[in-house]
């Protein structure tokens, strides 16, 4: 099974599939060379990006991520403030130190190719890395796929049409929403309780709790950074940061908040904008479950901790565990990759997870939590991924804010009912998968349709 820490991982913006994944793949390739004693034989490297990676790689920073990964950087620890200077130095010098130890000639314009119209068979986000010796002979070639949320699968697993599963036995295995509800009925556990029992299969309960609270800390720090920085986002669209200005407006608002019943929603919008502006700027974020949708769960969690009486760290833990359980269902039965199923797989999944998490934290029954997740996804079906300029800015940043409000609405609506509803979460996940399969490629993170072409034409 997938762990909650696979779904919530610390990384770098602007994209989990297009930045975090390529960085991990590149680092894995050169680390493998070193492990086999081949790294010092390398004189030249070649990297190729295909499909959605090739089409929007420049806007998503995929090319930069590959350079950093080859140099040994890891998404969870790379110095985000030093990325620009490090990449610029590689480009200016035409030299790259593999794993920061073995230096070779590397000209990005020659040795790093983005194929805008070519795809590999398994997944739209394909990469090929090759290493050569001083005689030009190939030392090793490997193919990797970035399948969403920072997950990377190599060619062998892709050929088996699956990611190699973790064989660690968990206490309460489940692959569908129906199975999850059956487990809760049989054990009397909440959804977060089931997930916690499973997480203990990998690490101690104390480590699970500490790890999740650390994830929450990184989310809070991301919001704080986003709320403190003005200016224009990189990439050429001249998108202005709005979170800092909105925060100042809310903090100095002379209008009595009690006079506006929707005042809290402005704060939720702020929290989401802050995260996604940081993500667009290449800052430190938590995949939740992807970078493109990274603002939704932190925004709804901030809503819970700041505006719900009696909110606690225990509630935060229940929120993240329940959200993770729903994320497992999307990852196992559909996709969280915009390049595979459109934005319904990213923002839709995150909205569903956040709705479930909030319903859990507010004391919902398993049936109500499942209902909240279903509502959150149902009303994101068909959502396209059409980033203007191939950047994770328009419509992505505002879309996270809107989905955060939608997640809160879904949770509150579910909690007003008894959990009985006409459409199951499993049916909605199946529908999302089928809708994504039917969706044209131009609406799946290629910047060749929708807003990506109409905004520029206007």
Can you annotate each of these PLM segments?
Residues 8-26, 281-300, 343-352:
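Conserved phosphate/anionic-ligand binding catalytic regions in large, soluble enzymes, centered on
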Residues 75-256, 267:
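C-terminal regulatory domains involved in ligand/effector binding and gene-expression control
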């Amino acid at each position: 099974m997938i762990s909650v820490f696979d779904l919530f991982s610390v990384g770098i913006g602007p994209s989990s599939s297009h930045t975090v994944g390529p960085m991990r793949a590149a680092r894995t390739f050169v680390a493998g060379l070193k492990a086999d004693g081949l790294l010092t034989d390398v004189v030249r490297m070649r990297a190729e990006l295909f499909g959605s990676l090739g089409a929007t790689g420049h806007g998503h920073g995929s090319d930069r991520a590959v350079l950093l990964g080859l140099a040994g950087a890891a998404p969870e620890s790379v110095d985000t403030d030093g990325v620009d200077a490090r990449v610029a130095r590689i480009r200016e010098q035409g030299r790259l130190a593999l794993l920061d130890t073995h230096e070779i000639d590397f000209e990005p314009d020659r040795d790093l190719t983005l194929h805008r119209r070519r795809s590999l068979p398994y997944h739209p986000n394909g990469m090929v890395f090759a290493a050569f010796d001083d005689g030009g002979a190939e030392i090793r070639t490997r193919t990797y796929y970035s399948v969403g949320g920072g997950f990377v699968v190599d060619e062998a697993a892709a050929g088996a049409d699956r990611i190699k599963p973790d064989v660690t036995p968990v206490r309460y295995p489940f692959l569908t929403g129906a199975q999850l509800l059956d487990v809760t009925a049989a054990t009397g556990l909440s959804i977060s309780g089931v997930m916690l029992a499973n997480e203990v299969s990998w690490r101690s309960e104390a480590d699970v709790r500490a790890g999740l609270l650390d994830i929450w800390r990184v989310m809070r720090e991301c919001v704080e950074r986003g709320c403190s920085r003005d200016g224009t986002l990189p990439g050429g669209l001249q998108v202005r940061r709005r979170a800092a200005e909105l925060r100042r407006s809310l903090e100095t608002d002379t209008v009595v908040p009690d006079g506006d019943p929707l005042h809290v929603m402005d704060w939720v919008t702020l929290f989401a904008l802050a995260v996604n502006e940081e993500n667009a700027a290449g800052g430190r974020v938590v995949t939740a479950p992807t970078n493109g949708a990274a603002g939704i769960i932190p925004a709804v969690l901030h809503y819970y901790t700041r505006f719900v009486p009696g909110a606690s760290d225990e509630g935060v833990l229940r929120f993240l565990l329940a959200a993770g359980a729903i994320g497992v269902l999307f990852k196992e039965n559909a996709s969280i990759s915009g390049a595979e199923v459109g934005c319904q797989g990213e923002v839709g999944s995150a909205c569903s997870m956040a709705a479930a998490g909030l319903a859990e934290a507010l004391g919902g029954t398993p049936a109500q939590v499942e209902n909240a997740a279903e509502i959150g996804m149902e009303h994101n079906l068909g959502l396209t991924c059409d980033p203007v300029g191939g950047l994770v800015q328009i419509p992505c940043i505002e879309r996270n804010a809107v989905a955060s409000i939608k997640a809160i609405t879904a949770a509150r609506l579910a909690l007003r009912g008894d959990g009985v509803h006409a459409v199951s979460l499993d049916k909605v996940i199946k529908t999302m998968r089928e809708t994504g399969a039917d969706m044209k490629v131009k609406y799946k993170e290629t910047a060749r349709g929708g807003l990506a072409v109409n905004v520029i034409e206007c």
